[in-house]
């Protein structure tokens, strides 16, 4: 273990101080948003606040704190001992990025999210359906403010997704402007951000059975 000399003997900074030091170096004495899991609320984040304010002589540390709830796997808490850890590299190899984004946005960040096959399948079917109203749009096409309102309300992603469903229904029966609004609202959160052809290629590639699985 690395250590340094001190008046009290050899020692090293604890993890609370490590985070305060990194925040000060890269973000400054005060910054806007600090995130982390709900399990870090106490004692880690409270210690960060106390020592950073004292060291920097400031009244605040971070202006806003966003604590996310846990992701479970089939209603079980993720744990290495259980062998049910969700690795990002595995997701990238098996799940299209759009499906992954929609799945993660399906619950508010403060609420637990259960990761299971049904969630992924439902999100894949939703994306597939939404591509029925896909339209190439200009990059500077703006999303109407009223559509964005849920995101202003403590990042209410389920509320925003509900708006996307309403926009899809309108786009399906409407004109090109309705479709453009729908697509721009989807692309604002990283959905429908590839061409319809690319999405179809992804579907086909996932539908093919590898030869080694046949033999």
Residue ranges and their predicted role:
Residues 1-139:
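Alpha-helical recognition segments enriched in aromatics with Gly/Pro capping
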């Amino acid at each position: 273990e690395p250590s340094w000399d001190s008046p009290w003997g050899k020692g090293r900074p604890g993890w609370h101080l490590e985070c305060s030091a990194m925040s000060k170096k890269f973000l400054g004495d005060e910054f806007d948003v600090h995130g982390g899991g709900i399990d870090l609320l106490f004692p880690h984040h409270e210690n960060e606040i106390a020592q950073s304010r004292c060291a920097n002589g400031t009244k605040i540390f971070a202006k806003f704190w966003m604590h996310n709830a846990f992701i479970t796997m089939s209603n079980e808490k993720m744990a290495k001992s259980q062998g049910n850890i969700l690795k990002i590299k595995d997701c990238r190899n098996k799940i299209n990025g759009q499906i992954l984004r929609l799945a993660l946005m399906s619950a508010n960040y403060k609420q637990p999210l259960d990761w299971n096959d049904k969630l992924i399948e439902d999100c894949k079917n939703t994306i597939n359906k939404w591509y029925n109203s896909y339209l190439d749009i200009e990059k500077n096409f703006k999303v109407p403010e009223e559509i964005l309102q849920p995101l202003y309300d403590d990042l209410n992603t389920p509320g925003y997704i509900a708006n996307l469903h309403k926009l899809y229904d309108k786009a399906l029966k409407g004109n090109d402007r309705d479709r453009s609004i729908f697509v721009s609202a989807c692309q604002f959160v990283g959905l429908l951000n590839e061409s319809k052809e690319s999405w179809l290629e992804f579907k086909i590639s996932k539908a093919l059975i590898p030869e080694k699985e046949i033999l």
